[in-house]
Structures are given as C-alpha cells and as structure tokens.
C-alpha cells in the first residue's frame, strides 16, 4: 500500500518503533493475534490512541478479532524500513558515546554506528565495540559520501554547534543531540534533543507536584 508518510502525525510516527518492538516479542513467543487492549497494556499507550494510530495505515485489524501479529509485524517492518540499514556516525567517545558504541543498537536491524570521532589521541585509531574511532579534526576526510545520513552528538555543549555546522555542510540529514545545547540547523535538517538532566529534573518535579492520576 502506497502512502504519504508526511501525513502521518509525528506523535504517531514516534510510537511506531514501540509497537514494532512489542510485536517482535509477541511473534517470538508464538502468539498469533493481539487485541488493542493487550497492546495498550504492554506499551502503556491507551487503546483508543493505538486504534487511531493504526487507522492512518488502513484496515490493519478486524473488529472482534483484533490484529494478526504476523501481518502487523510484516507491515511495520516494511513501514520502518527494517530491511534497509541506515549507517550512523557518533561524535564524542566519552562515557556516553562509549556506551553507545558497545551497544550499537544490536536489537535494531536497521541502524548501525559505522564510525565514530573524538579528539582524544588515546582513542583515535582504536576500535570501540568494533567501531573505528577517527580524529574529529579529519571529519571531512572520512565522511566523503552520502552513506551516513544520521549523527549522534555526545560532546561537550560548547562544541556542539560548531560540530553541527560541519555535519550539516557534509550533508547530514538528521541529528540525535545528547548535549544540553539547543542547536541551530537549517529547516531541512531533522534534530531530536535528548537532555538527560532535564528529563530527570522533569521527572522529579512531576513526582513532587502531580498525582499518578494526573499523568
């Protein structure tokens, strides 16, 4: 089925990998069908939202039957391009960056950190988790084609913008930013900010000032 993915709400698009992960677990356990209520309980998204999310893709289930796990898994694998690997570069091989390199999204068939960059001479020229670490000063020498469209930033905040400018000039299309810096990028660049300190502060605030019923 052909569809215009730009018409899918961004909130829905962000939930698709969550659904896909749960469906993989269901398939591995031998389950053949699942209801929206079961999905809701597993992924902690209300069933009405799940049905609305799925409705953007047409008739994925049947009333009274639920959803065929194999069909859904196949559908979302294709929708999320799980059979096509996207190479990623990582900038900053500190504690967080090193953890990413060792993990390297081994449970995600479609994403892989292909190379990393740092300024630490003790790390340059080594491999971490099987990923080569290059000199950040030679970024432009190593990223010479369009095969790596995504970058992960785990660098000090003060260096983030200048590195981002270089990545944009090299044709990077998306950045996952783990620095506190709010980066300026052209409109055609997709950037997701993940500030762990802010998320933690937000969690503590909600625990103190909101009841569980208000979440």
Curated annotation (Swiss-Prot):
Homodimer. GO terms for cellular component: cytoplasm. Residues 18-57 bind DNA. The lineage of its organism: Bacteria, Bacillati, Bacillota, Bacilli, Bacillales. Modulates transcription in response to changes in cellular NADH/NAD(+) redox state. Keywords: Cytoplasm, DNA-binding, NAD, Repressor, Transcription, Transcription regulation. Belongs to the transcriptional regulatory Rex family. Its main location: cytoplasm. GO terms for biological process: negative regulation of DNA-templated transcription; response to redox state. SUPFAM superfamilies: NAD(P)-binding Rossmann-fold domains, Winged helix' DNA-binding domain. GO terms for molecular function: DNA binding; DNA-binding transcription factor activity. This is Redox-sensing transcriptional repressor Rex. It holds the Pfam family CoA_binding. NAD(+) binds at residues 92-97. It is found in: Cytoplasm.
């Amino acid at each position: 089925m052909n569809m215009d993915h730009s018409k899918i709400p961004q909130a829905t698009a962000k939930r698709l990998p969550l659904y896909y992960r749960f469906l993989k677990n269901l398939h591995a356990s031998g389950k053949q069908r699942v209801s929206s209520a079961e999905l809701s309980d597993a992924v902690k998204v209300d069933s009405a939202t799940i049905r609305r999310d799925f409705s953007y893709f047409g008739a994925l289930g049947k009333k009274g039957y639920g959803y065929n796990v194999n069909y859904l898994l196949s559908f979302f694998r294709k929708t999320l391009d799980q059979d096509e690997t996207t190479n990623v570069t990582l900038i900053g091989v500190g504690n967080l960056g090193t953890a990413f390199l060792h993990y390297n999204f081994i449970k995600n068939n479609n994403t892989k950190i292909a190379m990393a960059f740092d300024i630490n001479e003790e790390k340059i020229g080594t491999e971490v988790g099987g990923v080569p670490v290059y000199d950040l000063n030679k970024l432009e020498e190593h990223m010479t084609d369009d095969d790596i469209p995504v970058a992960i930033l785990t660098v000090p905040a003060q260096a983030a913008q200048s590195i981002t400018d270089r990545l944009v000039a090299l044709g990077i299309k998306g950045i996952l930013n783990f620095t506190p810096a709010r980066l300026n990028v052209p409109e055609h660049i997709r950037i997701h900010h993940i500030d762990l300190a802010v998320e933690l502060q937000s969690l503590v605030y909600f625990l103190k000032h909101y009841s569980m019923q208000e979440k």
